Amino acid sequence: MATVPNDDGNRGDSRSDRSADCPAILGGTSVRPAGPPGWPLDDERVHAVLRRLIASGDWGRYHGEHVPELSRKLAKYHSVEHVLLCCSGTAAVELALRGVGVSPDDEVLLAGYDFKANFQNVLCLRAIPVLVDVDPETWQLNPERLAAAVTSKTRAIIASHLHGGVVPIREVRQFAEAHGLALIEDACQNPGAMIDGRRAGTWGDVGVLSFGGSKLLTAGRGGAVLTPRSDIAERIKRYVLRGNEAYPLSEMQAAILLPQVEQLDEQNARRRVAVERLCRQRNGIAGLTPLQIPTEDVSPAYYKMGFRYRSEEFSGLSRDLFARSLRAEGVAFDAGFRGLHLIHSKRRFRAVDDLLEASRADAGMLTLHHPVLLESDAAIDEIAFAIHKVRRSASEIVSRIPDGCVTNDAEL
C-alpha cells in the first residue's frame, strides 16, 4: 500500500526497494498492479432488481412499469416537468436540437473543444456548427466569445460540462435569453452536479443525460432529455412516436438505473471528497492543474477528472507519454477529446477566430477515469504517489521510451 509522498515526492515509509521507486514503464513495480478498478461496480441493489425483473418475465415487455418510474424519478430529482428517455446521450442531443426547432441552414454555437457527437448531431439536422473558443483557465465554453459568433441564422447554443468542469452556465443562459437563442445543456458527464443551487441539466431550455457504459449512471446505453417546457416535450414526442417509439430505453435498462439514481448524490459526495484529497496530495506539482475543484457554489460530478498538463514542468515528458506511464502504474489517465476544428473539414463548420484555447485543450487535456474516486483513501494516495514517481523520473522516461499517442476520445 502506498503512503502519502513527502514534499520531495518520496514515500513516508522506510522501504528502500529500488524497483518500487523505478517507474513501471521502465521495468519497475507498478504502484497499483491490479490496475484501474472496473465499472460499473458490483452492486447488490442492481443484482436484486435484475433478479426480480427476470423472475417476473417483465424484462421483455414493450411498455412496463420501470420506464415511466424512471422518468418520474428523474423529473423529481431534477425538479423538471418533462423527462423523455431514449437510447443514448447522443440521441438525446439530437432530440434536444429537434425539440428547440433547429432546422436546415440554422447555426448552432458550441465549444471548439467538445464531444464530437455534438458537432455531428448539428450536421445530422443539416444545420451549421459554429465553433466558439473555450476559457483559457477552465477549457469550458467561454461565454465571452459567444457574441462574436452570433448571426441572424443562429438558433441555439450547446453548453457541455466536461471532465468534472462546469460551464459558467448562468452567464450562458443570460446571453441566450438576451439574444433569443435556445440553450441545450449537456450534462452527460455531470449528472447530479449542483451549480449555484441548481442541478446541472436544468439551466437550459433542454438538458441531456447519458447512461452509456462508463457513465456515472449506466445501463450500457441510454439517455434522457429534460425540459420544463411542454412545447419542446410535445415536439420531441411527435418526432419519436411513429406507431412505436423510435429511440426507446428498455425495461431492463430502466430497472438497472433506478437504484443508481437513488445513490447518485451519495456517490458524487464521495467522489468530491476523493478529489479534494488528491488535490492536497498533488500539491506542489506544477504542470498538472485540476480543471475544477468543489467550491461553495459548484459541486461537480466527476465522470472524469480533468487536468491541464504542461510537459515543460515534467522535463519535456509529453502528455501522451505521461498517460502511458501512469497507465503502467495502474492509474487510468487518458488524453481528452480532440479539438473539433482539428478533426473536421473547415467546409463543415464556421469559426470566428483561430480557436487557440481549444487547440491547447486538444494538446494538454488529461483525464482521470472516475471509478477509483469511490475507492479508499489509500487508493487516492497511491495515485498521488504514482504521479510523483513518474515526475521524478520524467527525464529518464523521455530518454528511454519512444513517445506514442494515447487515443483521444477514450470512453472506457
Predicted regions and their residues:
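Conserved residues at the C-terminal ends of beta-strands
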Residues: C86, A111, S160, S210, ...
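Structural detector of well-ordered beta-strand residues that form the stable sheet scaffold
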Residues: L84, L109, V130, L183-I184, ...
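Buried hydrophobic packing segments
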Residues: A92-V100, N118, G223, L257
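PLP-dependent aminotransferase class I/II
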Residues: E69-R72, V80-E81, E144, A156-S160, ...
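Active-site PLP attachment segment
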Residues: T202-R235, Y247, E251-I256
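Conserved PLP-binding active-site segment in aminotransferase class I/II-type PLP enzymes
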Residues: M1-A91, L95, G99, E177, ...
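Glycine-/small-residue-rich active-site loops that bind phosphorylated ligands and cofactors
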Residues: D114, E137-T138, G164, K215, ...
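PLP-dependent aminotransferase-like
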Residues: V102-A187, M194
